[in-house]
A protein has these predicted regions:
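FNR-like FAD-binding dehydrogenase module
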Residues: 1-292
Length: 292
């Protein structure tokens, strides 16, 4: 954070003062990105690069050391399956950065190393990312990678509904990952849900297994004729709902484009008309996103 660099500059000497102050200033925006943001340079590495900056403990903890922000994870289970258990599906962050350091995610690594029986501080936020009240309402679930997390809970919920005698509406599940052999998490549970009629279709995109990269948005377009009536609300007793979970930067935007393409292709809508349909879906709480 620039605030931390400014604080370090206040206790530095020589050329370190000028350099740190510049990095913390609006004029040093590009240099900050090159030095801090892009290589994921850690606070320890910064302090090693500027050895004259030696803060006392008060300044260090008050203005320099970053306060850890809470991490938000989607619950990947349903109380209908086990009222005493809550699960989370977390990708462990571990990558080598430009400085040569192996960067490990603070929260994901903590969870990975947690011992059985260890207490972990958590809190639960109220969410609108939930199945329609009517089990006959058709749904489309789109969640590559750990974006499948909430849909695992959805499948457990629909399994319990089916077991209680409820009639289930159509449910399409789109999942994606890089490699089938390495990244197809919960494959057995997805296939079981398909066999048992908990979902009506399962489409999986593997982006690294073939000569051409295939993503969930490609699978959505392939299934345009089935996706279209659910998005339009012309199938089932209730209007359909779309659920998207995962990457906000690329995936969610690409899925939105794919749905627009489906509406234009199958419904012969102009672009602005298709956009208005999706806008109404969002306004009517039929287009849900849990993205990061």
């Amino acid at each position: 954070r620039k605030q931390a660099l400014a604080a370090l500059a206040s206790v530095a000497s020589g050329k370190d003062v000028e350099k740190l102050a510049f990095l913390a200033s609006p004029a040093g925006k590009d240099e900050f990105a090159q030095y801090i943001t892009q290589p994921h340079r850690s606070l320890l590495e910064v302090m090693e690069d500027f050895p004259s900056a030696v803060p006392d403990l008060g300044l260090f903890f008050g203005a320099i050391a970053p306060r850890l922000a809470p991490r938000f994870y989607s619950i990947s289970s349903s109380p209908a399956a086990d009222a005493n258990t809550v699960t989370a599906t977390v990708a462990v962050v571990k990558e080598k950065v430009a400085t040569g350091r192996v960067h490990e995610g603070v929260a994901s690594t903590f969870l990975q190393r947690a011992a059985e029986g260890q207490k972990i501080p958590v809190f639960v936020r109220t969410s609108t990312f939930r199945l329609p009240e009517n089990p006959e309402a058709p749904v489309i679930m789109i969640g590559p990678g750990t974006g499948f997390a909430p849909f695992r809970g959805f499948l457990q919920e629909r399994t319990a509904q089916k077991a209680s005698g409820a009639t289930l509406g159509p449910a399409m599940l789109f999942f994606g990952c890089r490699n089938e052999s390495k990244d197809f998490i919960y494959e057995d549970e997805m296939q079981a849900a398909l066999r048992e009629g908990v979902i009506t279709s399962l489409d999986v995109a593997f982006s690294r297994d073939g000569p051409k990269k295939v993503y969930v948005q490609d699978k959505i377009i392939e299934k345009a004729s089935t996706v279209y009536p659910i998005v339009k609300g012309t199938v089932g007793k209730n209007e359909g709902a779309v659920f998207i979970c995962g990457d906000a930067k690329n995936m969610a935007k690409d899925v939105n484009k794919a749905l627009l393409s489906v509406l234009m292709r199958e419904g012969d809508y102009a672009a602005h008309e298709a956009e208005e349909i999706l806008r109404r879906l969002k306004a009517g709480f039929r287009y849900h996103q849990d993205v990061w």
